[in-house]
C-alpha cells in the first residue's frame, strides 16, 4: 500500500506486503496513558501495529518494571518488528519516576546499556529511535509533604547554576539558603542521580554518533531557565556538535512524537498560527527556552514543514504576556480571567473553522490544563481536528503533532482521540481535578498518593456525571464541549495510578 499526503507526494508504506501492517517495537517511558496509550492509538489509527510490553512486567507508579521481563520482551519481538522506538529511562531505570531515584545503580545502568548495544547490533538493519530525559530541576513529589523539599531543591538548583554564571555573591547566598532547607542525604542522592543520568545521556549521544541509534531525542523535563540541568545541557550540546540525528528540546512524555518518528514519510506541511500573541518568544512554565524553539525542533524532528499556504493549521493559543497559570496548584475559581483575550482568540479559531481549515488547537493559556473561558466561546468545537492542553506546553505539543501526523497518514481525522483530549485536558485538568483534590483532602486523602483509590475513582465518576448532567452553574462554560462528546458516544474515566495528577479517558466507538 502506498500512502500520499494532500499534495500527492508518496509517503512511507504502512504495509510491508498486502495486508501486513508496519510493526513498531515500542518501549514507552512508563505505563501512564500519555506514554503507553497515546502512541498505541495514533500508530494503530494510521494502520501500523504497536508491539508493547505486557502489563505484568511493566511499571506502576513507584514500582519499576521488571528488568528481566523487559529484556525477554525485546528478545522475543525484535525480529518481527520493522522499527524500534525505545525509551532509555524505561530500559535502564524501569520508569521515569525510577530515573529520579537511586533504585538502579550507575553500574547496573552501564550493564543494561551494554546489553542493549550488543543486542541491537544483532539487528543492524532495524532503525532504532531512542528517547531519554535530562533530569528535571527538582525531585519527585510522591506525597504532599514532599512539596517543601521540592520547592527548596528547585531554588537550590536555580541559584547554584545562576551563581556559577554570574559570579554573584547574592546568587550564591540564595543557593546556600535553599540548601539548608534540604536534608543532607536528599542532596547527596540528588547529585548522585544527576551524575548517573548525565552519564547515560552522554553515552547515548556517543552511540548515536557512531550510528548504533538511528536518532536520539533528549528531553528536558520540568525545568527553569537556570539549574544544574543547564550545565549538563552545555556539555551535551558540545558533544552533539550539530549532529542532525540528535535533538534536545523541552518535554518528557513525548511518546507520540517518538512513535510517529518511526513512520514519518517525506515531509508533510502545516501552517503555524499564533493566536493571542504574535510569536512564540515566551518561555512556557516548567521549560527553559523560548517556546518557538521547542516548536521548531519538534517539527524538524518529525520532518514537518511550516507552509503558510497549508490548509492544515497548528493554532497555538497563548496570552499576550505568555504567562501561564498552573491548573494543578490553582483553585478552579481563581483561574485566569482575560475576557477580551478569550473572545479574540475564540473569534480567530471560529474564522479558521468557518473558512474550512483543518485546525489542530494547542491551548496554552494555562499550564496543566485548558482554559474554559476560551474554549466555551468556540462556536463549533466539533469542527476542530485536534485539541491538546495537558501538562507542559511541549508535552501538549508532542501529543497534538503526533495526532496530526497520524491523521495525515490515515487520510482521516481521529475524532475519538480529540474527544478524549477534551475529556482529559479540558474537563478534568482545568476543572474536575481541583474539585476532586479539595474533596479528597477533606476526607483525609492525599491527592499525590491516594490511600483509597477506589473511593477517589468513585468520586471522579460522580463529578463527571454532574458535569454531563449540567448540574450546577459551573458546568455551563463546558456545555459546548460536553455536547460534542455526548453526540459522539459514551465515555469512561479512571485513575491509572494511585494519584489524581492524570486521568485515563476513553470514548467508546
Predicted regions: what is each one?
Residues 19-509:
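An N-terminal assembly and electron-transfer interface module characteristic of large anaerobic redox
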Residues 1:
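A small-molecule sensor/coupling module
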Residues 4-21:
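Short, Lys/Arg-enriched N-terminal segments with co-localized hydrophobic residues
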Amino acid at each position: 500500500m502506498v500512502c500520499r499526503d494532500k499534495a500527492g507526494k508518496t509517503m512511507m508504506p504502512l504495509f510491508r506486503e498486502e495486508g501486513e501492517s508496519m510493526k513498531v517495537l515500542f518501549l514507552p517511558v512508563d505505563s501512564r496513558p500519555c506514554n503507553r496509550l497515546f502512541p498505541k492509538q495514533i500508530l494503530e489509527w494510521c494502520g501500523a501495529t504497536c508491539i508493547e510490553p505486557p502489563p505484568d512486567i511493566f511499571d506502576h507508579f513507584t514500582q519499576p518494571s521488571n528488568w528481566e521481563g523487559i529484556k525477554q520482551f525485546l528478545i522475543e519481538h525484535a525480529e518481527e518488528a520493522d522499527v524500534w522506538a525505545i525509551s532509555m529511562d524505561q530500559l535502564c531505570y524501569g520508569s521515569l519516576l525510577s530515573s529520579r531515584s537511586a533504585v538502579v545503580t550507575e553500574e547496573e545502568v552501564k550493564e543494561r546499556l551494554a546489553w542493549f548495544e550488543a543486542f541491537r547490533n544483532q539487528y543492524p538493519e532495524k532503525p532504532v529511535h531512542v528517547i531519554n530525559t535530562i533530569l528535571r530541576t527538582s525531585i519527585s513529589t510522591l506525597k504532599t509533604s514532599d512539596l517543601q523539599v521540592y520547592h527548596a531543591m528547585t531554588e537550590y538548583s536555580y541559584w547554584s547554576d545562576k551563581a556559577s554564571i554570574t559570579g554573584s555573591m547574592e546568587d550564591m547566598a540564595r543557593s546556600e539558603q535553599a540548601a539548608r532547607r534540604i536534608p543532607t542525604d536528599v542532596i547527596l542522592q540528588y547529585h548522585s542521580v544527576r551524575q548517573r543520568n548525565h552519564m547515560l545521556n552522554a553515552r547515548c549521544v556517543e552511540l548515536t554518533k557512531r550510528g548504533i541509534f538511528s536518532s536520539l531525542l533528549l528531553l528536558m523535563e520540568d525545568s527553569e531557565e537556570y539549574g544544574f540541568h543547564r550545565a549538563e545541557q552545555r556539555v551535551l550540546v558540545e558533544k552533539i556538535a550539530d549532529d542532525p540525528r540528535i535533538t534536545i528540546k523541552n518535554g518528557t512524555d513525548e511518546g507520540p512524537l517518538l512513535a510517529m518518528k518511526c513512520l514519518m514519510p517525506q515531509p508533510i506541511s502545516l501552517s503555524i498560527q499564533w493566536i493571542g500573541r504574535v510569536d512564540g518568544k515566551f518561555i512556557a512554565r516548567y521549560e527553559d527556552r523560548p517556546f518557538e524553539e521547542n516548536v521548531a525542533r519538534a517539527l524538524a524532528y518529525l520532518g514537518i514543514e511550516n507552509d503558510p499556504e497549508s490548509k492544515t493549521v497548528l493554532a497555538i493559543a497563548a496570552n499576550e504576556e505568555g504567562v501561564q497559570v498552573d491548573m494543578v496548584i490553582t483553585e478552579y475559581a481563581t483561574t485566569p480571567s482575560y475576557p477580551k483575550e478569550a473572545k479574540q482568540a475564540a473569534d480567530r479559531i471560529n474564522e479558521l473553522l468557518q473558512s474550512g481549515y483543518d485546525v489542530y488547537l494547542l491551548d496554552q493559556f494555562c499550564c496543566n490544563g485548558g482554559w474554559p473561558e476560551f474554549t466555551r466561546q468556540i462556536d463549533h468545537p466539533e469542527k476542530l481536528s485536534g485539541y491538546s492542553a495537558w501538562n507542559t506546553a511541549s508535552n501538549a505539543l508532542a501529543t497534538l503533532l503526533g495526532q496530526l501526523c497520524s491523521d495525515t497518514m490515515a487520510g482521516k481525522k481521529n475524532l475519538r482521540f480529540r474527544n478524549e483530549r477534551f475529556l482529559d485536558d479540558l474537563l478534568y485538568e482545568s476543572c474536575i481535578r481541583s474539585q476532586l483534590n479539595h474533596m479528597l483532602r477533606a476526607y483525609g486523602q492525599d491527592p499525590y498518593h491516594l490511600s483509597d483509590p477506589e473511593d477517589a475513582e468513585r468520586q471522579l465518576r460522580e463529578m463527571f456525571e454532574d458535569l454531563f448532567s449540567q448540574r450546577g452553574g459551573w458546568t455551563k462554560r463546558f456545555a459546548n464541549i460536553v455536547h460534542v462528546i455526548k453526540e459522539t458516544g459514551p465515555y469512561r474515566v479512571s485513575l491509572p495510578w494511585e494519584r489524581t495528577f492524570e486521568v485515563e479517558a476513553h470514548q467508546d466507538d
